[in-house]
Curated annotation (Swiss-Prot):
Active site: D312 (proton acceptor)
Name of the protein in its database record: 3-phosphoshikimate 1-carboxyvinyltransferase
Major subcellular site: cytoplasm
Acyltransferase in keyword set: no
Binding site for phosphoenolpyruvate: K20, G92, R120, Q168, R385
Family (UniProt): Belongs to the EPSP synthase family.
Organism, scientific name: Streptococcus suis (strain 98HAH33)
Subunit composition and interactions: Monomer.
MF GO annotations: 3-phosphoshikimate 1-carboxyvinyltransferase activity
SUPFAM superfamilies the UniProt entry points to: EPT/RTPC-like
InterPro entries xref list: Enolpyruvate_Tfrase_dom (IPR001986), Enolpyruvate_Tfrase_sf (IPR036968), EPSP_synthase (IPR006264), EPSP_synthase_CS (IPR023193), RNA3'P_cycl/enolpyr_Trfase_a/b (IPR013792)
UniProt gene name: aroA
Cellular component terms per the entry's GO annotation: cytoplasm
Length: 426
């Protein structure tokens, strides 16, 4: 796919699609609640559609009426054994979170995915889940998919210290703990996105927090709700960066989720001196309108507890850093190596081929800026983030064509991406 390059400016207003993390969890909680839950602005990206289909295969009635998705919840006890293996597509979120849901069921199921997902280790989930009394196994010592799980209706509670800051592992254990007999305790390493915890409360459940400890009582039931999903800050990130680095630009993003565990990119933009304002802040919905304008940017350091709050945005933040004055250092981001690709190497290779100066490290990157960009041929390797990052980078390319291979990966999280990009050029 040939990408549009070297635009003069980007101007306009965009309402980004519903948050992917919240959309996944919406389908899960709606299925596990009793009654009909109605969701507005749910994402229809391929990953979320995978989660939706899996719960249909588990016996849940889900109706997509365009603006509204209705989930006819059956509770933990109402899920049915699937007739076939469960297809997770490319979604690491789906396979990890649903592992926790299936942990307390009295049937066996096998979960598989595409070639990319089949290379992603699942042992971070399988090891602690196995300690709760179920049987779960994958391929090789790292438990690559397919995963086969034989649940246990009499799950043992667990006390588990998370070895890494992973919201997916934490959430899988929470879903299992909700089905266990007694109290489970999960000890967090660092702050991670807390959508699962928030939604437990939204659906009438309870959690107790003590510092980095989360205490979960087993045997809880959830009540159907009506919920509006805020816009995905991970999707908004591409427009935030575009508005900051494309000359003469001003972009307004409406209804963007600003959950404090996800706003690391906003902290980075402030540290770099970007022109950004938040308005129409809704404290209850944790959303706001964000406006950005072309800015003179300075380098910064991105590390430590900031990393889990922007892990999915690091590819586009790397592009941002190529246009900042000075040397930006990203470290403590080894989690990027086990995304759809080795994201550290793939991002560095892609942007370097376009003229950037990036040194990949074991746990991050060193980015020297500002640098002019030019045309190149880039492969997404099936990673939607790489695709959208490249599309924004192409807007700065002065010479040569930018050709994107496997551009269809963008549909994983943002099917309307190019439509929205074109609207900013009009």
């Amino acid at each position: 796919m040939k990408l549009r390059r070297s635009v003069e400016k980007l101007k306009g207003t965009i309402r980004v699609p519903g948050d992917k993390s919240i959309s996944h969890r919406s389908i899960i909680f709606g299925s596990l609640a009793k009654g009909v839950t109605r969701f507005h602005n749910i994402l229809r990206g391929e990953d979320v559609l995978s989660t939706m289909q899996v719960f249909r295969d588990l016996g849940v009635k889900i109706e997509d009426n365009g603006d509204i998705v209705e989930v006819h919840g059956v509770g933990f006890d109402g899920l049915q054994a699937p007739k076939n293996d469960l297809d997770m597509g490319n979604s690491g979120t789906s396979i990890r979170l649903i592992s926790g849901v299936l942990a307390g069921q009295d049937f066996e199921a096998t979960m598989f995915g595409d070639d990319s997902l089949s290379k992603r280790p699942m042992d971070r989930v399988t090891i602690p889940l196995s300690q709760m009394g179920l049987k779960i196994s994958g391929q090789t010592e790292r438990d690559l998919p397919p995963l086969t799980i034989k649940g246990n209706k009499n799950l043992k509670p667990i006390r588990y210290q998370l070895p890494v800051a992973s919201a997916q592992v934490k959430s899988a254990l929470i879903f299992a703990a909700l089905q266990a007999e007694g109290n489970s305790v999960i000890v967090k390493k660092d702050l991670t996105r807390n959508h699962t915890e928030d939604m437990i409360v939204q659906f009438g459940g309870q959690l107790k927090f003590n510092g980095k400890e989360i205490r979960i009582q087993g045997g809880q039931e959830f009540i159907a709700q009506e919920i509006t999903v805020p816009g995905d800050i991970s999707s908004a990130a591409f427009w935030l960066v575009a508005g900051l680095i494309i000359p003469g630009s001003k972009i307004v993003l409406e209804n963007v989720g600003i959950n404090e565990t996800r706003t690391g990119i906003l902290d980075v933009i402030k540290a770099m001196g970007g022109k950004m304002t938040l308005s129409n802040i809704d404290e209850l919905a944790k959303s706001a309108t964000i406006t950005v304008e072309t800015s003179e940017l300075k380098a910064t350091e991105i590390a430590g507890e900031l990393i889990p709050r922007l892990i999915d945005e690091l590819p586009i933040i790397t592009l941002l850093a190529t246009q900042a004055h000075g040397t930006t250092i990203i470290c403590d981001a080894e989690e990027l190596k086990v995304k759809e690709t080795d994201c550290i190497q793939v991002v560095a290779d892609a942007l370097n081929s376009m003229g950037a100066t990036i040194e990949p490290t074991e746990d991050g990157m060193i980015i020297h800026g500002p640098t002019a960009l030019h045309g190149a041929e880039i492969n997404t390797f099936g990673d939607h983030r790489i695709g959208m990052m490249t599309a924004i980078a192409a807007l700065l390319a002065k010479d040569g064509e930018v050709v994107l291979e496997r551009a269809e990966a963008i549909n994983t999280s943002y099917p309307a991406f190019f439509e929205h990009l074109n609207s900013l050029m009009d």
